[in-house]
Amino acid sequence: MSDILETICERSRAELEAQKAAVPFGEMLERAKAAPQRASFKSALRRKNGNPAIIAEMKKASPSAGVIRADFRPSELCVALENAGASALSVLTERNYFLGAAEYLEDASTRVKIPLLRKDFIYDRYQIAQARAIGASAVLLIAKMLSPERFGELFAFAKSLGLDVLAEAHDERELEMVLENGADIAGVNCRNLRTFGLDFSTTERLLKLVPDGVVKVAESGVNSRDTLLRAADAGADAALVGTLLMAADSPADELEKLLGAK
């Protein structure tokens, strides 16, 4: 696991234990099972008019960039991004480094119809049950921070609750691991988690290794119409785009430009 992942997970453990004390796992699981089924995340990740589907990411900050959007209004953003053509939304719920909140996702679930991905650093079944309870259609599992056995366990648990899983890989070994464990949505993150640098050629190389029948997602580095088209040429069905949108004066206008609508 990279240094930043270790740091983030260490800070989240105490918070997770407090959440478990307030709402025990059994109760959270019942909430998850009682929650209404939302739109399918996987089904939404289909190309439209030649463009990869856009998973628009709502985040106020990141470890690499600091505060990206000081005037962060998630209740307004989710609706604006849906109307601008987002196929799905990725909602950061990690509090310390991304300044996210589970409440942002829960609120978005009442305002939009497109599927919601819980973007967090997930290593415990509780987080998955909570995601389902607050309105997520999918969760992110990061190969770099999970053993193959743990990945497989969490993947199966998410599927048992009707959640899709975006399985994130940074290299060939991680990609092979998630595919061997049944991943049907494979995401490639070309960010070096030690230096925070981006190398989009990593995305292009790894996406071509994902077999047919598995949804292919470019998870980082799409910062222009040109890189979106490069992702498409490499076989991407979808692209997750956050910083480009959140740093724009109008995220909705920026999304329309990305899709070639403006």
Language-model region placement:
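An N-cap/entry alpha-helix motif that binds or orients negatively charged groups
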Residues: 2-69
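N-terminal small/glycine-rich loop or linker at the start of catalytic domains
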Residues: 44-66, 101-108, 152, 204-212
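Active-site mouth loops of central-metabolism enzymes
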Residues: 55-73, 114-123, 164-169, 217-222
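Glycine/Thr-rich beta-alpha phosphate-binding loop at enzyme active sites
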Residues: 58-71, 80-99, 176-205
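Conserved anion-binding
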Residues: 113, 117-201, 208, 212
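Catalytic cores of alpha/beta
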Residues: 123-134, 170-181, 218, 222-241, ...
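Catalytic-face loop-and-helix region of soluble metabolic enzyme cores
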Residues: 185-241
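C-terminal helical cap(s) of enzyme catalytic domains, especially alpha/beta-barrels
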Residues: 205-209, 232, 245-262
